[in-house]
């Protein structure tokens, strides 16, 4: 009896423990189910989760320019060298000792300016001798003419023969010939004396002297005394491809002088402006180019002989052309294209047909219109339809630095 009583209590205790365990099990399961919707909702509201947590980074910064309509000049370009209009080596035409130089190296001189002097003593002596001989022979001629006049009277009275009259006539003629020779000798001596004073044959700039005062010089010296280069005006000889010849000839036929500009080696500074002078009469078969000569007044001495320059010749002007910065024009598998911005700052690729272009701007013949906005910088980050941030040129770097800083901040937070 006592044993069965204990067995019943054991069964009761086991049942109670099982009931408590079941209660806690079902209570925990219900808590998990009720917590799941809240956790999901919280995740959706969290900045780090859902769509808001996966939003894209900052907009790509770009620079843009507006296509404009303007008149665009068409230039032909070539490489060339400045050449003097005339180059003269000043030499002495007589032999003698150089006693004076009357120029400063590098100065501008005019035709007729005295440059140098050779000792004139010997030439003065020769002139005096020639003049003396001329005077002597003139006196002889005067006496012969008087004798001839007397002979002409005496022959009428037969006091002199006809033969004597003819002889006297021949003497007069001979003396007249001698006078002419004497006059030529005087002129030659005077010329030699004049040549002892050496003058500039042309206007121009004198170079460095080739001989010093005191030296004996002669007319056969090849180096001369000094070289004069005529730089007012001055010429530019440059080359153009043979394919441009027809364009130049057509522009010449229009009747207006073609303007030629001379630019420095780096093509960054305009040195002077002149006009086309002539085309060569044949093409260089080796290079396929033709030589062209232009002339410049060069009153400011901006150009020097043998100076290397870049030539630009204006041959035409294209009116009402659509122009954009050259930086906006890109090349792809499909050809040339530009990125065009719409009113919402979204970009789209437009295929275009380029025309005249230089380092700064390019004419677009088809593909866009005046007023369209095109991307000029930040092009490598673009995709079709992407929205961008248009920034000023001076702030583009700042925008990129800000974007980079944000990216680094994100990486730091994740790490």
Curated annotation (Swiss-Prot):
The keyword Nucleotide-binding does not apply. Gene3D superfamilies: 2.40.30.170, 2.40.420.20, 2.40.50.100, Helix hairpin bin (1.10.287.470). GO terms for molecular function: efflux transmembrane transporter activity. It comes from the Bacteria. Transmembrane segments: none annotated. Keywords: Cell inner membrane, Cell membrane, Membrane, Signal, Transport. It is found in: Cell inner membrane. Induction: The mdtABC operon is transcriptionally activated by BaeR. Residues 399-415 have a biased composition (Basic and acidic residues). One of its GO terms (cellular component) is plasma membrane. Residues 32-59, 392-415 are annotated as: Disordered. Part of a tripartite efflux system composed of MdtA, MdtB and MdtC. The MdtABC tripartite complex confers resistance against novobiocin and deoxycholate. Belongs to the membrane fusion protein (MFP) (TC 8.A.1) family. This is Multidrug resistance protein MdtA. It comes from Escherichia coli O17:K52:H18 (strain UMN026 / ExPEC).
């Amino acid at each position: 009896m006592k044993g069965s009583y204990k067995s019943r209590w054991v069964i009761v205790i086991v049942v109670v423990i099982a009931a408590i365990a079941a209660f806690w099990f079902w209570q925990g399961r219900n808590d998990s189910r009720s917590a799941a919707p809240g956790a999901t909702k919280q995740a959706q509201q969290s900045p780090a989760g859902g769509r808001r947590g996966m939003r894209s980074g900052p907009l790509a910064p770009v620079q843009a320019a507006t296509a404009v309509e303007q008149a665009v000049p068409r230039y032909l370009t070539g490489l060339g060298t400045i050449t003097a209009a005339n180059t003269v080596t000043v030499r002495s035409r007589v032999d003698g000792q150089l006693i004076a130089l009357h120029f400063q190296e590098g100065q501008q001189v005019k035709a007729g300016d005295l440059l140098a002097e050779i000792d004139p003593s010997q030439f003065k002596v020769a002139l005096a001798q020639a003049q003396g001989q001329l005077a002597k022979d003139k006196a002889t001629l005067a006496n012969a003419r008087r004798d001839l006049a007397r002979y002409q009277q005496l022959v009428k009275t037969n006091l002199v023969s006809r033969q004597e009259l003819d002889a006297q006539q021949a003497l007069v003629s001979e003396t007249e010939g001698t006078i002419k020779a004497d006059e030529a000798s005087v002129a030659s001596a005077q010329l030699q004396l004049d040549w002892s004073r050496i003058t500039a044959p042309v206007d121009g700039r004198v170079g460095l002297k080739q001989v010093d005062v005191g030296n004996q010089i002669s007319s056969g010296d090849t180096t001369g005394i000094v070289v004069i280069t005529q730089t007012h005006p001055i010429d530019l000889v440059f080359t153009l491809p043979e394919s441009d010849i027809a364009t130049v000839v057509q522009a010449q036929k229009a009747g207006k002088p073609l303007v030629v500009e001379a630019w420095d080696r780096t093509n960054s500074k305009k040195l002077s402006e002149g006009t086309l002078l002539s085309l060569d009469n044949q093409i260089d078969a080796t290079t396929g180019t033709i030589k062209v000569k232009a002339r410049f007044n060069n009153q400011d001495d901006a150009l020097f002989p043998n100076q290397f320059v870049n030539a630009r010749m204006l041959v035409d002007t294209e009116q009402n052309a659509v122009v954009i910065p050259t930086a906006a024009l890109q090349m792809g598998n499909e050809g040339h294209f530009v990125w065009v911005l719409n009113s919402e700052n979204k970009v789209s690729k437009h295929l275009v047909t380029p025309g005249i272009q230089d380092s700064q701007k390019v004419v677009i013949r088809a593909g866009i219109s005046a007023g369209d906005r095109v991307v000029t910088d930040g092009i490598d980050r673009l995709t079709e339809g992407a929205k961008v941030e248009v920034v000023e040129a001076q702030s583009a770097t700042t925008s990129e630095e800000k974007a980079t800083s944000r990216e680094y901040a994100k990486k730091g937070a994740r790490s």
